[in-house]
């Protein structure tokens, strides 16, 4: 890992909580397969790039939760004159991203405790990552801390309503938690209002993918590393009878294009006062 000990790195390290280690391990395992099935992630990230303020030209940008580095490379192309940092909690993703380039440095780090100096960057870009953070106020406080005056936090995330079809179908089968939980959009509004950052954009929209069958959907979730990571999930394999019941329940949602999977995506662009 590059030595960034000069004015960039903060004096503290990163202390990942146990649940974060589980998330990191899951995404590390998915690194090799991620890009092949990341249609939603690419589309959402492109929309987030388009939401950046017109004429904005950061001298130093951070791709927070960089994953395979797809948007690190996009940011490097867009802001060629700036320095780029790619940050992720999953070492497997960082290894994959580092091999493909794009950023000047690749750093293991946690969005709730960024390994960056105060006032050290102009843009924090984070697409579909902070939904895995338990402490959203800490994420926003860290963004405010590390941004320079006039700097921007641009993020996309997921909120309640995501994978509702799958959640409702599992409810027909049993009482276990089978689908990742996400915070309500009202929480984003509340915490952004108290963050000390000025919201330029804060909205949500539904994006719907279609799959020929349930197996295709669950395969994609696993390939993305985004399968069920919640406490309360069932241990061990799911029996054939329950799977058949799940398939039957999900078929109620079938549309002409296939089985829908709805992602309720939050877009936020927040600026630090100059």
UniProtKB/Swiss-Prot annotation:
Organism's domain of life?
Answer: Bacteria
Q: Report what the protein is called.
A: Malonyl-[acyl-carrier protein] O-methyltransferase
- GO terms, molecular function: carboxyl-O-methyltransferase activity; malonyl-CoA methyltransferase activity; S-adenosylmethionine-dependent methyltransferase activity
Q: Which GO terms describe its biological process?
A: biotin biosynthetic process; methylation
Give the enzyme's EC designation: 2.1.1.197
Q: Which Pfam families match?
A: Methyltransf_11 (PF08241)
> Which pathway is recorded for this entry?
Cofactor biosynthesis; biotin biosynthesis
Q: What does the UniProt keyword field contain?
A: Biotin biosynthesis, Methyltransferase, S-adenosyl-L-methionine, Transferase
Recorded family membership = Belongs to the methyltransferase superfamily.
Q: Which organism is it from?
A: Pseudomonas paraeruginosa (strain DSM 24068 / PA7) (Pseudomonas aeruginosa (strain PA7))
What reaction does this enzyme carry out catalytically? Answer: malonyl-[ACP] + S-adenosyl-L-methionine = malonyl-[ACP] methyl ester + S-adenosyl-L-homocysteine
Here the disulfide bonds are none
What function is annotated for this protein? Answer: Converts the free carboxyl group of a malonyl-thioester to its methyl ester by transfer of a methyl group from S-adenosyl-L-methionine (SAM). It allows to synthesize pimeloyl-ACP via the fatty acid synthetic pathway.
- Asked if the Swiss-Prot or TrEMBL record annotates the protein with the keyword Amino-acid biosynthesis, the reply is no
């Amino acid at each position: 890992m590059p030595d960034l000990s000069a004015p960039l790195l903060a004096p503290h390290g990163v202390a990942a909580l146990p649940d974060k280690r589980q998330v990191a391990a899951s995404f590390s395992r998915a690194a090799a397969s991620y890009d092949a099935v990341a249609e939603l992630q690419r589309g959402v990230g492109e929309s987030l790039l388009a939401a950046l303020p017109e004429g904005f030209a950061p001298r130093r940008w951070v791709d927070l939760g960089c994953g395979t580095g797809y948007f690190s490379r996009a940011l490097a192309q867009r802001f060629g004159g700036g320095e780029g940092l790619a940050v992720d909690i999953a070492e497997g993703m960082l290894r994959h991203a580092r091999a493909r380039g794009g950023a000047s440095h690749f750093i293991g780090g946690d969005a709730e405790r960024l390994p960056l100096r105060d006032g050290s960057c102009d843009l924090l870009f984070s697409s579909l990552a902070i939904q895995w953070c338990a402490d959203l106020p800490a994420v926003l406080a860290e963004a405010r801390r590390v941004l320079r005056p006039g700097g921007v936090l641009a993020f996309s995330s997921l909120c309640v309503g995501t994978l509702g079809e799958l959640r409702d179908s599992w409810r027909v089968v049993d009482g276990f938690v089978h689908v990742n939980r996400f915070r309500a959009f009202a929480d984003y509004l509340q915490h952004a209002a108290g963050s000390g950052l000025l919201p330029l954009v804060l909205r949500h929209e539904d994006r719907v993918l279609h799959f020929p069958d349930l197996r295709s959907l669950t395969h994609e979730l696993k390939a993305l590393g985004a399968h069920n990571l919640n406490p309360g999930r069932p241990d061990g394999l799911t029996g054939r009878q329950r799977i058949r019941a799940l398939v039957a329940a999900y078929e109620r949602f079938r549309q002409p294009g296939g089985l829908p999977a709805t992602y309720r995506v939050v877009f936020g662009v927040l600026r630090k006062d100059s």
